[in-house]
């Protein structure tokens, strides 16, 4: 018996698994299989990375993933109404139903060169870690369970989601819990990116496109007409002066601004896109309320400056990711910690915005784990992945899925 076989069995006992699971040599064989097939897992990671999956256009990569799930023998493999890919690995019982998931989309536009480069052990390419690593890990977990003949007491539902990034606003995972699998998920694990961290804090966000609109006019001839760009500037200045708590961490950002047609024309409109974040729902709500007061004040200031009205303020919500937190003492977090220890991964807990946000907000046991290895420059064209001992991330995901499905 190797050290990894012993670790798998010890983990099953420590995590509170049934005695039959703890004594099942197939679980240990599955961990060994993960290590043996890691080179193939990395090849799959590269293959998926070279299939573009820009925001709202994930279908080509999703089709490749659907085919992979069918080849692994999953049942009821399908697309749902929003484009998520779903397959079922039945257990001895329909419950507990554990979702093991990874997101399909990247932040990169359609024209991005997604060819992957290998330099020594390092692999680089846009999306190679976030989230082609997660997608490949989920497939490897299923493959290793199949090779070892593991039949979990509960069911594993495998999902590749759309819309995790940016203005996708978690549309895939929201549909999953609101429609496709509503009321039928007992635990949710998302695999996202490279590394070893366990994300148990859901950083919530509210995102807006704010537009000030007015009649416009010539910069000289119509001088004195309330100016949308000036109102926008007043709003940004007031917004930048807001005080937010350091704990719970709460942040804000003006990410994009625009408007106007010419240097010598009063704009018809000026706009900004804004991101508000906090891990605490109450802090996020307070920041949101303060932001809207800033907008009202900026509009009033611009009207008062010229002694007349004429501007309109359009507030469009373009993103709403709920905040929340799973306590470190929660069984699902404890199981993830023990799985990390069992395979020799460092234990680290953090907070982020991931697909797990939504089930956490619904009170469903959920978290996100990174997929092993090491990587940097996520969301950049020169993103890279170092596969040294990356199999440990897959092994952790496997152990966690098996124990949750007990």
Predicted ranges, named:
Residues 104-118, 185, 200-211, 367:
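Acidic-glycine-rich active-site phosphate/pyrophosphate-binding loop
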Residues 11-54, 202-204:
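N-terminal hydrophobic or amphipathic helices/low-complexity stretches enriched
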Residues 114-125, 213-217, 378-381:
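Glycine/charged-rich beta-loop-alpha catalytic/anionic-binding loops adjacent to active sites
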Residues 2-12:
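Bacterial N-terminal signal peptides
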Residues 13-29, 45, 76, 228-406:
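Metal-dependent amide/peptide-bond hydrolase catalytic core
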Residues 122, 127-205, 244-245, 264, ...:
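Acidic/histidine-rich catalytic neighborhood of metal-dependent amide-processing enzymes
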Residues 88-133, 189:
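Catalytic-core environment of secreted peptidases
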Residues 43-95:
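A non-catalytic alpha/beta surface segment that caps or lines the substrate-entry region
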